[in-house]
Amino acid sequence: MKTHHHPTTFVHLINQMGLLGICVALVVAFYYQLIRHELPCPICLLQRAGLIIAGFGFLFNLCFGLRGIHYGMVIIGSILTGVMASRQICLHIMPGDTGYGSAFFGLHFYTWTLITSILIIIAVAVILAISSINVAFRSLNINPDLFSIVGWVFLLLITANLISTVLECGGGECAANPVTYKLLSKQDIAFLKTGLLTRTVLRL
């Protein structure tokens, strides 16, 4: 994946970090889905879609140059993500409700997703406010190939997300509280779990 050849300015650095952060968030989501077998609910899938839209905005900035329409994609994706995360928070706000899925540092992932979407919007606001300041970080000497790799990882995660969503939901409506993949038999799921467990043990 080709990116614009330019010195690493503060604005470009924020775009690079934004794309990397979204990749990390998607990797964590897939870890809990594949390793801990916590399938995403429909609202969770919409939150992932919002993050992917925001990620495309960052990716387009790095590949085709800084554009207002790219930042618009980031903001729209972040707003969609934030709205969906807020909706899920409201669904589990009643006393005694343990929430959906695992907690991370005391907060559920949809709460972290809301925080992330707000931080992304703030980052874009900072970028737009200082976009006229072209301060180069030449001393950082960041290899552009590193962020080409991040771009390819992002596209791979999108493909994996699409495949897993089709397997989970099939051709119809996604289950509100999914516990299995509609397009996979029990034998297929057992085989995948065994393979993932074996790979995890071998890495350890």
Describe each model-derived feature in a short phrase.
Residues F60-F64:
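Hydrophobic alpha-helical transmembrane segments
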Residues M1-P40, L51-G57, R67-L204:
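Secretory/periplasmic and organellar redox-cofactor proteins
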Residues Q47:
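Cys/His-rich metal-chelating microdomains
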